[in-house]
């Protein structure tokens, strides 16, 4: 990245990280990683004709399935001081797009509402921002320090992307339920199935991402005909990643089919892996 800064200082650079959890894990990628990925995809989805961009990534990140480009584009939101923005509508947008309501905003993907103020930490932002409303008029947008809560600078506006790769809407929940039952049969005892059916987030639900959308994409669908530069060991890295995914899937599948002893010390519920 330092080399790119030297040779192309004027071109914006986007970091696109891989999930920081194992394939078929019981935990989700961290909020910071999910936020960074969605911020990058949102920027790329709306970047046509906006000038050159450089995306810095890894093979693990590039081949990871994502929501379709249409979903990413539809989740974008922007506003500027002087515009009419309903606080209720904005709050609903944040909740629907994976932001977590908190009393005080400290991490990416969080938001807080206090009267005519909305604090939020947009994906990809260096600092959280504070939206100051008078009624339904957005009066100002300010960046602030999460530790001190003090304003650091005034901003011309706000651009938001979804904070998570799984958006729980009526449509996506219904699609997940149908796909899960088709793949694994009736699963009323599955914690992921139960939580999603109730419209709740569940740790690790991103590992069933294809069930939430009619189609999925990868980073390459957002780049289009852009130039791609590969490190010389990319084939080896891709093969290693594919092997790791296959190994983790096989381990989960074997565990699912293995008989469970009544006296088994394994208390975790069965994990129903989606084939890669």
Range-by-range predicted roles:
Residues 1-276:
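ASCE RecA-like P-loop NTPase motor cores
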């Amino acid at each position: 990245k330092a080399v790119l800064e030297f040779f192309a200082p004027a071109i914006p650079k986007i970091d696109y990280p891989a999930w920081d959890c194992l394939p078929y894990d019981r935990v989700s990628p961290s909020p910071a990683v999910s936020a960074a990925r969605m911020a990058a995809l949102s920027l790329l989805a709306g970047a046509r004709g906006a000038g050159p961009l450089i995306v810095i990534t890894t093979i693990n990140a590039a081949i990871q399935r994502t929501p379709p480009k249409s979903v990413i584009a539809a989740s974008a939101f922007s506003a500027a001081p002087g515009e009419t923005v309903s606080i209720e509508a904005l709050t609903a947008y944040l909740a629907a797009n994976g932001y977590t309501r908190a009393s005080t905003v400290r991490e990416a993907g969080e938001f807080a509402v206090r009267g005519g103020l909305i604090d939020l930490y947009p994906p990809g932002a260096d600092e959280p921002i504070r939206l100051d409303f008078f009624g339904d008029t957005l009066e100002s947008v300010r960046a602030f320090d999460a530790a001190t809560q003090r304003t650091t600078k005034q901003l011309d506006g706000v651009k938001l992307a979804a904070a998570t790769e799984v958006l729980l809407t009526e449509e996506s929940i219904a699609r997940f339920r149908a796909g899960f039952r088709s793949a694994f049969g009736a699963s009323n005892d599955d914690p992921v199935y139960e939580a999603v059916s109730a419209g709740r987030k569940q740790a690790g639900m991103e590992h069933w991402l294809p069930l939430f959308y009619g189609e999925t994409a990868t980073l390459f669908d957002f780049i289009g005909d852009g130039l791609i530069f590969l490190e010389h060991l990319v084939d080896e890295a891709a093969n290693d990643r594919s092997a790791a995914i296959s190994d983790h899937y096989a381990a989960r599948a074997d565990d699912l089919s293995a008989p469970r002893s009544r006296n088994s010390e394994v208390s975790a519920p069965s994990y129903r892996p989606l084939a890669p």
